[in-house]
């Protein structure tokens, strides 16, 4: 009979116990009771936070939005077709966040910061919360640096500064996206990082914008965040916050950023869809009660930092679509009240061939001339006044049969100034050329020309000025002031061009 050796057994047991390294972890698990229309209801998950990420057994992720006494309402970040009733759901213990890095420049990504341009994965070592608090009052400073859009009508009369939030509002097909994309094109060489967020748009429209950026060399400093019309409502709702998180990454590194939200009407509609499916009580136009907070917490993240924080900035240009020019609808009034001004695009002006179709009368920038260089202030004041007088006189002229000579001259000048504001798409002008163009119009040099000749004359003048008087651009760009020397050079160029132009017309 074999004898039991107690010390040997003891040694084996000790070795086995020492080798045992199984970790015990606590996981917050729930079970699906209902799923459909991008919403899942879960029982369990007692310790879940509002906005926490959850993971379903088949891999889909979701965000906990409704925390009710009996169940949790989850919005799905995917189609959720494989999720089954009774399957397990695990809380991750994390709020939604995305990776961030310089490697995102030049890429097209979705709301989860995953690349969708077929150019491989993006390597990032850092991450940021999709929703982070806006900078406080103490960390900000007032807007004082101009952000040039390259559009004469905006830079002269509705100036935008770095750190400002300026709404672009108008009916569909009035050129809202064109104004935003031209602004991005004009940032070339300005050391501004641009983020273009496309929400609920057709894939063909987004592809067209990306192609334009590639052709004009703007993709080098631009990130495109795109969620198309066929994307789940949750991802359309998240896309602007993803864009803001990427822009913030650069802003906190003392860089200047520009972010376009195209457009926030579709984000509000996606949020309304989610809220109604979660059975939240509807309010005005069936939007939930917190739809104002949806946009205010997004747009308040745009800021101009003070010198202690490195003077970085994030300029936001949200776009909102109106129905038949109705700016008193719920979403337009909300966003107008949050932003620092609005650029109103009119369908009537667009159809009349005035493009960009900016209605200068009801557009406003609440930052004003603080966001203009001195040279622009010197020439733009007269332009605003003359266009306002022209609009008033034009309305009166419709009913008056005979007008005196002064009024006729004023109307003729106004028509030429309106012609001067027209610009073709993807053709932004540097501020030096804008100053020259406005000066030519407001000083009456265009009065002798036919309206049809104005565009051709100005194009040739800008080229002539660039070729023969390069000192003009140097003076404006270095001193930011319209000096006497600059004015003399410009007058000479205008006179030379008028003579050349009259000879051309005669031949």
Curated annotation (Swiss-Prot):
Record's bilayer topology term: Peripheral membrane protein
Family annotation (Gene3D superfamilies): 2.40.30.20, ATP synthase alpha/beta chain, C-terminal domain (1.20.150.20), P-loop containing nucleotide triphosphate hydrolases (3.40.50.300)
EC number: 7.1.2.2
Compartments it resides in: Plastid, Chloroplast thylakoid membrane
Site (Required for activity): 362
Keywords (A to Z) from UniProt: ATP synthesis, ATP-binding, CF(1), Chloroplast, Hydrogen ion transport, Ion transport, Membrane, Nucleotide-binding, Plastid, Thylakoid, Translocase, Transport
Family matches, as InterPro entries: ATP_synth_asu-like_sf, ATP_synth_asu_C, ATP_synth_asu_C_sf, ATP_synth_F1_a_nt-bd_dom, ATP_synth_F1_asu, ATPase_a/bsu_AS, ATPase_F1/V1/A1_a/bsu_N, ATPase_F1/V1/A1_a/bsu_N_sf
Catalytic activity of the protein: ATP + H2O + 4 H(+)(in) = ADP + phosphate + 5 H(+)(out)
Single GO term (MF): ADP binding
ATP-binding among keywords: yes
UniProt GO cellular component terms: chloroplast thylakoid membrane; proton-transporting ATP synthase complex
Residues that hold ATP according to the record: 169-176
Family statement: Belongs to the ATPase alpha/beta chains family.
Record function comment: Produces ATP from ADP in the presence of a proton gradient across the membrane. The alpha chain is a regulatory subunit.
Subunit structure: F-type ATPases have 2 components, CF(1) - the catalytic core - and CF(0) - the membrane proton channel. CF(1) has five subunits: alpha(3), beta(3), gamma(1), delta(1), epsilon(1). CF(0) has four main subunits: a, b, b' and c.
Protein name: ATP synthase subunit alpha, chloroplastic
Record organism: Saccharum hybrid
